């Protein structure tokens, strides 16, 4: 296990002094109701918001409060955190119960996002605020460099459409692939298809509109990484 954790710490860019904190940060509730990452997630969520808030405040001295709020929301939302977690390869190190493991929980956006926040909480306790901030800012550096008050004002579907039109690509298509539950507690799975690049992006939301926005955001982030 320690060898695996050493590889993970290399990916994170942080060396834990207390490995039990890292192990706890990787343990899902499906393994243990009492010893899991939820408390660390609570701490990491607050710390991440503070780190990103300060970074945006310093990076955009002329931005209004509303613009800062929208940029922060874009950076700390679940889909973005899940992408960062995938870039770090976090999913393969998660400790899941049998049911979650069989259902592919290590690929689920919500679990990946929660685990990333729990890692942040664990780093805060293990190494203190300055070191935690340094590591988190390194993870988010490409997104902080790319974001602007103007881009944060437009929703993801609009920004994706503008990006595609500017390059004379075909516009995306959206399709609901699954609806779970009963109203008003339904969840919608939507896929966004980009024919030009032969890619499909799938997201889930509490409404069709929210799911489409999340799928569009995933598509746009992938395109910007591949082409810009």
Swiss-Prot record:
Subcellular localization(s) per the UniProt record: Cytoplasm
Protein name as it appears in the record: Ribonuclease 3
A GO cellular-component term linked to this record: cytoplasm
Positions of the RNase III domain: 5-128
GO molecular function per UniProt: double-stranded RNA binding; metal ion binding; ribonuclease III activity; rRNA binding
Domain of life: Bacteria
PANTHER family in alphabetical order: RIBONUCLEASE 3, RIBONUCLEASE III
Annotated NCBIfam families: RNaseIII
Pfam families: dsrm, Ribonucleas_3_3
Entry function: Digests double-stranded RNA. Involved in the processing of primary rRNA transcript to yield the immediate precursors to the large and small rRNAs (23S and 16S). Processes some mRNAs, and tRNAs when they are encoded in the rRNA operon. Processes pre-crRNA and tracrRNA of type II CRISPR loci if present in the organism.
Family in the record: Belongs to the ribonuclease III family.
Residues annotated for Mg(2+) binding in this entry: 41, 114, 117
Gene3D superfamilies, alphabetized: 3.30.160.20, Ribonuclease III domain
Keyword terms, alphabetized: Cytoplasm, Endonuclease, Hydrolase, Magnesium, Metal-binding, mRNA processing, Nuclease, RNA-binding, rRNA processing, rRNA-binding, tRNA processing
Subunit structure: Homodimer.
Residue positions of the active site: 45, 117
UniProt keyword annotation of Protein transport present: no
Reaction catalyzed: Endonucleolytic cleavage to 5'-phosphomonoester
Alphabetical GO biological process terms: mRNA processing; regulation of gene expression; rRNA processing; tRNA processing
HAMAP family per UniProt: RNase_III
Gene: rnc
Enzyme Commission identifier(s): 3.1.26.3
Domain DRBM: 155-225
SMART domains per the UniProt record, alphabetical: DSRM, RIBOc
Cofactor(s) needed by this chain: Mg(2+)
